[in-house]
């Protein structure tokens, strides 16, 4: 376990986070030192995005409702807790939305930095700031230190994917928690979450994204469980 404090917020990192990120970075496909460096850059980039995401929850929650937040990172994601905070429903939605906004901000900053870094060079009269769009000439790519470019690219890619995933209206993802804060009926919220999760299972399976498929299956099962409990006597409205 790695423990430290950032901006007054205790942070705990479980070893499973590094294991998961290494697998996603294709550590088992490494055949050279360059491959290994790319995997390490992927892990660092993903860690920056995940930590920034959870710190967004923590700092905004503390600002709005006080208390002492803490951040725990494990597997593929994290959890921000602040049991002593006093938040209204609206403030809870704002705190939840702060996570995806902060992780997206990482990608925006990386995109601007990459554009300024690469776009300050001209080759044949063509500005090269279009690298992030995937149309940078190969000759230009070879003329820059590749580590910096890979790092920026990973930050942009992971930031976009992580933000999009978390904003899906599936409980307990951020999108689902925002939906919970805006809706009165928990049963309806879980039904919507279940429906979206099933759609995502079918979509990700058709694309061959098996890790995402498994993740969505778990979320579908979880929301189906909550929905059945509420339907058979649970407290629906909150």
Give the label of every model feature segment.
Residues 1-238:
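Hydrophobic transmembrane alpha-helices and their immediate loop junctions
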């Amino acid at each position: 376990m790695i423990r430290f404090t950032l901006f007054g917020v205790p942070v705990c990192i479980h070893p499973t986070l590094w294991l998961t990120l290494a697998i996603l970075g294709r550590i088992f496909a490494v055949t050279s030192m360059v491959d290994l460096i790319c995997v390490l850059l992927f892990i660092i980039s993903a860690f920056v995005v995940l930590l920034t995401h959870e710190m967004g929850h923590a700092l905004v929650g503390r600002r709005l409702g006080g208390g002492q937040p803490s951040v725990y990172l494990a597997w593929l994601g994290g959890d921000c807790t602040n049991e002593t905070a006093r938040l209204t429903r609206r403030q809870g939605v704002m705190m939840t939305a702060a996570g995806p906004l902060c992780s997206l901000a990482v990608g925006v900053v990386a995109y601007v930095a990459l554009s300024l870094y690469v776009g300050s060079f001209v080759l044949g009269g063509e500005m090269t700031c279009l690298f992030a769009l995937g149309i940078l000439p190969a000759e230009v790519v070879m003329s820059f230190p590749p580590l910096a470019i890979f790092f920026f690219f990973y930050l942009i890619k992971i930031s976009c994917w992580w933000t999009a995933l978390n904003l899906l209206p599936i409980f307990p993802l951020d999108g689902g928690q925002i939906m919970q804060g805006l809706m009165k009926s928990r049963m309806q919220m879980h039904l919507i979450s279940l429906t979206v999760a099933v759609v995502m299972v079918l979509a990700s399976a058709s694309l061959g994204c098996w890790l995402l498929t498994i993740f969505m299956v778990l979320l579908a099962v979880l929301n189906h469980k909550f929905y059945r409990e509420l339907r058979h006597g649970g407290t629906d409205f909150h």
